[in-house]
Amino acid sequence: MKTVIALLIGAAVSARLHAQARGGEWTTTAGDAQRTAWVRADARLSREAVQEGQFRFLWKMKLDNQARQLESLTQPVLLSNIISYKGFKALAFIGGSADTVYSLDYDLARIFWTARLNTWPVKNSTVACPGALTTVTRATPLGQTGTAPGPGGGGRGANNNVYVIASDGEAHTLNPQTGDDLVQPVKFLPPNAKAMGAILIDPILYASTADNCGGASNGVWSVDLGHPAKTVSTWETKGGRVAGTAGPVFGTDGALYVATADGEYSDSTYSNAVVALDPKTLAVKNWFTPGRTPFTTSPIAFEHGGKHLIAAGNRDGRLYLLDSASFGGSDHKTPLDKPAPYASVLGDFNAGALATFADPDGTRWILAATGGPVHGDTKFPAANGQVINGAIVAYKVVEQNGGPVLQAAWVSRDMAGPVPPIVVNGVVFALASGEYRTTDSQMTAAQRAKQSKPAVLYALDAATGRELWNSGTTITSFVHAIAPSAGDGQVYVVTHDGVVYAFGIPLEH
């Protein structure tokens, strides 16, 4: 018995050291519950390492997924430390649009398991409503990405489980070691609903829906997977779609936030707004609206100077900064700040999400992508060449007249159709998607794909926007609305043709 106990203690200690060496984890869309897209700590990946030439292409893997319209693979979520039946493993979980989930051993660049979900054939698939698996998550803490995880035991107890919403609307809880359903799938959304940004704040699973696909109302959905009844709760916008690509956002004050796009605009609807919801009941707590101008990104949430702040991007080319305590004031229309537009082609600001981070000095930054030239009314102190097709722009959160405001800081080099950026240890990773973007609803997915170009990944200095590295011609297809994810010294890109690319700093074995 003493020998067994000693072995168990040794394994636990080894797992803890293994986890601490590898850094934090990307567990959900945009990395964490606040959707910051920021990995705070990484043991290997840093600005200095990139400048020294250590960052490079590592591997690529073609998955046997069949794209549905423009949907293909989901943003990878990571489990950097699990004690599996094959020993210590570092896994990436990726959903395929054709209702398949893949687990990749990213140290060895091998498929660990494949799970094919039992769903009905999709009928009447369209570009707007593809009838696809579009989101995968793990259990996510309310804090931010970048602290070392505990030892992963797998199975039910440690809740390293993988949560997936299939195209038929059922929520699956998959064993991270095998891909098997741990429990009976739960009826969550209507079949063929367009789910975005699934996130599990244990034991409640949340997701947003858009475009009224499958008859699912635009809004936010939740189900308590820990309760026997598995009752589903819903909040409906009664107007515009939920904006952006990151889904529901948990503020640092504990409330749930979503932004909404264009739709019926009246006192009984929540179009063109940022809305605060109670996370337990999904009842509306407060809202802000700038008027008849729709939001185009999911919000981000962060704490600054003792305030719980929210930011979101709008089709008018502006960022809106909100204080969760006042949230637009008594008229619901007064933000903390809305600087001059930075997107000159209004409506092209459609990357879907933002990113935020704090530098070592404590300065808070907000990053956004624009799909066209930068607006002349915004003067960025640091520029990195002429912008024609799009770029990443950066703002600092500074104090002015006793309150926080946004101060333009830098604009990156020109990029073709950038998706939302991510941040790791002072490095901004920006992906020029290469996707042909159009407002022509009659244009098919195949026609759009034909006019798209290969994506390019860029590494930028987070302080200046200066280019440190790029992937050149390594990537051979475009990316549809999926930002990279990162962790454990690596950055992952998924392309429309079903290929996963890994870039990073090689792990010494």
Predicted feature residues:
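Mature, folded catalytic cores of secreted/periplasmic enzymes
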Residues: V13-S14, H480
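Sec/Tat signal peptide C-region and signal peptidase I cleavage site
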Residues: A15-A19
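Extracytoplasmic/lumenal domain signature
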Residues: R22, A43-L70, S80-A90, D99-A132, ...
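Bacterial N-terminal signal peptides
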Residues: K2-A12
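Predominantly extracellular/luminal regions of secreted and cell-surface proteins
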Residues: A21-R47
